[in-house]
């Protein structure tokens, strides 16, 4: 880092501290800003100046070494949300930190508090990201209060030629920390709708955590002469976060609408379906999603005008669906690149200049 950058760092931290002091502390979602690359390094700001509610700040002060894992968990959740919805009408768009006005808003804007299917997915994927990141840190030996899962040691099935060993991911600690950091007590809220939405968010947080636990897999290593695999050492490991994202996207597609008049426990909105139990890993929502086809400045919805689409696809990225029946524009993009490169002795590379034309389709 050059001298000018070093001199500018204190000013940058002070600016972020001032901006973040404007963030509402009582919300669950502002911690998600930590996953944005342009946010900077939260460890340099300190717990007091981070966009956390009072409970989260207290936990941060007691366990400051967890900040890198919290930041990585937020980054994982944001990245996977954008990946899963990159071809959808709602593409998991996040606010930017280019202005104070945007930085003071929830990262996902309207969707974070709307009580829709999109809200459900955001809470689930972010909670899952936190579990995944913290558990990875435990397994890597980066923390003193957790490590590998020791409950499986010395177990297995000798008669079948395998035993538990290695380092199983301690997902239970990751889930415990995620609950401690994210889940607000319902008793602290006022208003019937607020209580229903908070209960919904808490359920979806847990659904995200359950997804990580449910998709745990078993890896094994063979031992024996010449790779005979006479004995296997096995351990439990978390699935890739991409696989967890696919699982939660499927849950999003099959999410359950609940009644906004829930009293003691959440119920399905449709009375004829109430005999079917709600499972821990189901995603729940209260309100139907808004129209993402057209711009709605009040809700911060950009619409799909100008989005690139696939003319030949019948899926969500196809021009017919993504453009909501409005049609699309086609323009030709010229690409110039180096090609057919050859090494000439001695000592340079000679390339041809190749041009290609590509049709690009964008929604009207």
From Swiss-Prot:
Record's keyword terms, sorted: Developmental protein, Disulfide bond, Extracellular matrix, Glycoprotein, Lipoprotein, Secreted, Signal, Wnt signaling pathway
Entry GO terms, CC: cytoplasm; extracellular space
Chief place where the protein resides: secreted
InterPro entries: Wnt, Wnt16, Wnt_C, Wnt_CS
Record flagged with keyword Repeat: no
Signal sequence annotation: 1-29
Family label: Belongs to the Wnt family.
Protein name: Protein Wnt-16
Lineage of producing organism: Eukaryota, Metazoa, Chordata, Craniata, Vertebrata
